[in-house]
């Protein structure tokens, strides 16, 4: 099974409590956080994100340049500020982006779409999460090379994802299991639960502690 590389886009969807955030953090802990900055948009103030060891909090108008994990907490009324920061990321290039929750970016954010459509050439890897994919910008799905799909409670959400993922999402998997779709290989794999959040946080701590010693 392939994992996304430094230029790929990954969409992770699932209902609240399905395991998507833990899976997304596992993916992030495996990415190149020791070689580039990753900006995490924590719209929902998720505690598992805010508890990442060695992460740094930044304001919505900051643009980190050194490797590591940087968390920002946009308010619902800061869509213009989010767009401005995303344009700065697009212009700078070489910065990873993690968005939780995807639909809170806004349905018509041109900077977000630019990163999705041009992220590969500009080396902007992206991880986007959503509990309601039917509300999310369709460019997230059309441009993603990898999908991870957990339990979705709403039929409209399942149908929305099935337009891009060749799996019968009405067939419920065991708790915390997911469908993993590699678009390039046109291959669907059923994944077991990812490691515990404690194990994931330890991996962050190990990797980020090492780069803090060199910065």
Regions found by a protein language model. Give the residues of each.
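Walker A/P-loop NTP-binding active-site region of P-loop NTPases
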Residues: 18-58
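Conserved P-loop NTPase mechanochemical-coupling segment
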Residues: 60-76
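Short loop/helix-cap segments at secondary-structure boundaries that form the rim of catalytic
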Residues: 46-53, 63-66, 137-142
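Aromatic- and Lys/Arg-enriched surface recognition patch
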Residues: 166-174
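Glycine-centered loop/turn motifs
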Residues: 68, 94, 174-179
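Short, well-ordered alpha-helix to beta-strand connector turns
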Residues: 7-8, 35, 66-68, 93, ...
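Conserved P-loop NTPase motor cores
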Residues: 10-29, 75-167
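Conserved P-loop NTPase motor module
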Residues: 4-14, 23, 32-33, 175-215
């Amino acid at each position: 099974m392939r994992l996304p590389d430094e230029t790929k886009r990954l969409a992770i969807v699932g209902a609240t409590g399905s395991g998507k955030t833990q899976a997304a953090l596992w993916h992030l802990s495996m990415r190149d956080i020791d070689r580039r900055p990753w900006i995490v948009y924590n719209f929902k103030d998720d505690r598992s994100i805010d508890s990442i060891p060695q992460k740094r909090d930044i304001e919505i108008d900051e643009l980190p340049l050194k490797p590591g994990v940087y968390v920002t907490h946009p308010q619902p009324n800061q869509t213009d500020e989010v767009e401005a920061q995303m344009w700065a990321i697009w212009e700078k290039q070489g910065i990873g982006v993690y968005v939780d929750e995807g639909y809170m970016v806004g349905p018509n954010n041109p900077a977000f779409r630019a990163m999705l459509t041009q992220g590969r050439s500009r080396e902007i890897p992206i991880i986007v999460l959503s509990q309601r994919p039917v509300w999310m910008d369709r460019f997230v799905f059309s441009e993603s090379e990898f999908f991870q799909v957990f339990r979705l409670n709403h039929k409209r959400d399942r149908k929305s994802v099935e337009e891009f993922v060749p799996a019968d999402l009405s067939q419920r998997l065991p708790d915390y299991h997911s469908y993993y779709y590699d678009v390039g290989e046109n291959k669907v794999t059923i994944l077991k639960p990812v490691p515990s959040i404690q194990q994931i946080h330890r991996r962050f701590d190990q990797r980020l502690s090492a780069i803090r010693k060199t910065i």
